[in-house]
Amino acid sequence: MLKWIQGGISAVTGIAEPEYGQEYIHPCTERVKGKQPFHVTSTKDFEWRNPDYTNVETSTFYFTDLETGYTGFAQVIHSNIIGLHTTAQFTFRIYHKENTDDQIWTSVKLENFRIEGTNFYADNLSIVMNEEGTEVQFKSTVDENVEVDFTIRRAVDGVKVGEDPSTYYGDDVTQPWGSMRHVFWPRNHISGKIAAKNEETNVKIDLQFSEEKKHYSMFVFAMQGMKPHHAAKSWTFLNFQSEDYTAVLMEFTTPKSYANTTVNIGIVCDTKNILSVTVDNDAEYIDPEVDSVGWPVPKEISVSFNGINADIKDDDVESADPFNTIVKGKLDNLVERVDVMAEIPTFVKNIVSGVAGTKPYIYQFFDDFELTIKDQESKGFGWCEITFISESSEVEESAYDEN
């Protein structure tokens, strides 16, 4: 999902907004109601936009090795703060489902970075998409302890919701003051290698990817064109991969300034085709328990993907048979609870802490999941991220305290 905590976190400067109401948010999912949500992406959809206002763009490649139990992601974050300061960051995580100490995390600032259409370059790093828009190569040695060199190849079509996959904030869609956008390659073959080590913890991982084995990747390209705690108060993200199916959920709920509006995008595919792109999904948190920092963290999650088949035309949507798939799993393996406030500069922390109820945490899980479709069950692995950002939109006087 959009890792707004990493790299571009300074974009959170600002205080809470007035209570605008639902008419000030224009979800991409609403524009496809009564239509076929699934649109095939083009290469142009994955071009870096690099606007001159506050934004964070991320290019994230999740990988899942069904044979060894390894998962993780490699990511580049490109952020622009108020149109004045642009930064870029490489982040990487690898994690083993059974040997939970067998994990490595790194985050490194990038130098001399540049954008060329769909491609991104920096010292000792490159992300390059081929002209046909079927493959992406990711290479990085920016961290001397982490070597990444893999290529993903699309197994199914790329996905966007509607012709324009952006959700807009503001009273005028043609001149919005904020936006959120996601485009996906939900299921990809992956080949190459990852070599990572952490001498302090005595962890060394050498992972070889091959298209002939049960190795899969999910690629999401995202842009958040506004301050994160204004855009959303919570997120739910799921990347499920099995030998036969992929299911992806990207869901966020706005703060009450935008009427607690939920926008959810679901994708279900098999090994060769997109089965459905769904925009009426239900992510159920089962047995939530308030933890030591005050958030209701579920012990299990069940996601119902509800929509229509991907091959239904707009004119036939009303009479189309419903599509339904359920993906569920216990959240037993907490990879990390990321304390967002511990990661940001003091000045920004003072501002954000002045927004009452703002205590952002990201919970990352990796567990066994099961997908059910037409009475057929498929077991696989799921990477799930649950993010809590804020409970309120009220502002305290301390929001203005820069000390």
UniProtKB/Swiss-Prot annotation:
An annotated GO BP: response to oxidative stress
Q: Can you say where in the cell this protein is located?
A: Golgi apparatus, cis-Golgi network membrane; Endoplasmic reticulum membrane; Cytoplasm; Nucleus
Question: Its membrane topology, per UniProt?
Answer: Peripheral membrane protein
Q: Which domain of life is it from?
A: Eukaryota
Which parts of this chain are annotated as the region Peripherally associates with membranes? 1-18
The entry's family comment says:
Belongs to the SVF1 family.
> What is this protein's name?
Ceramide-binding protein SVF1
Q: Which organism is it from?
A: Kluyveromyces lactis (strain ATCC 8585 / CBS 2359 / DSM 70799 / NBRC 1267 / NRRL Y-1140 / WM37) (Yeast)
Q: What is the lineage of its organism?
A: Eukaryota, Fungi, Dikarya, Ascomycota, Saccharomycotina
